[in-house]
Amino acid sequence: MDYRIEKLSAETIRHLVPLYKAAFHQKVSYKFLLKKYDTRSVGPEFIGFIAYTSEGLAVAFYGVIPCFFQLNGKKVIAAQSADTMTHPQHRKKGLFQNLALKTYALAAEQRIQLVFGFPNQDSYPGFMKLKWQFLPDQLQVFTIKAANFSYSRLLYRTPGLFSIYNMLLNGLLSVEHPDASFFGEKISDGVIRDDTFCLYKKYNATHLITIDKVKAWIKVDGKLKIGAVQGLNENNAAGFIQRLTSIASRLGCRDVIFMTSKYSLLYEVLKKTLTPRDAFPIGFLPLQSEKVSMADASFEYCDADFF
């Protein structure tokens, strides 16, 4: 079968709505996707390609999200590998590889230095074929059970009800979002969490809460996910985790989830009381020069496109 390939744009992105449902059995809005791929504040925008059948049906997509990135101590533009989707009836036809290569070529033309990402077990083999490089340590996840039953998850799967639930969350929790001062000085390589980053991340519904002078950037989508924390240390960690778990239970979340790079400050604090496990590989593909090292890069949950 022949496929027509078109670049992602503010117009064509609406075709991802039915494709998203067919590929992932999840409903997303055109508005959500538009905000996610609108990265004008960084420079390059709508970096990705869609494959169509001769009848005009969108059946595959691959896209990356440009961001400011610290690489070897210097500020550059990188891009995070984001949505990878293929309609179930059009898989194993080479569409992922084709769209990815076109996307990387476009990104290179836009002077994007590298693509990075956290592929799951299903997409990992495909990225290996694309000659991605992977760090020796994966992202680490810490999971705390908060309740035996998650009504938040049930609501999350019902868009109409979850909208009402989100309105209630906005009433119970702060609708404040973090700014650059929340993160402090950038020391390690990785995503630069400046005001541009913080404004962009508003495409997802998140909240900023304070527990005993510790601030946490959270997302509630059936689970309570911690994007980043400020002020956490060995002395207050136990009390913070206990209060956070209680909040998660009241919000109907079964689990509290932290995710961070190994050897980060957050990792060092959490591992004293919680047991980590591997979450996702950390991979990258240089686009401008093969002499790229990500050995000193560190990531938090908030850096991922799924937070």
Predicted regions mapped to residue ranges:
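Conserved acetyl-CoA binding element of GNAT-fold acetyltransferases
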Residues: 75-88, 221-233
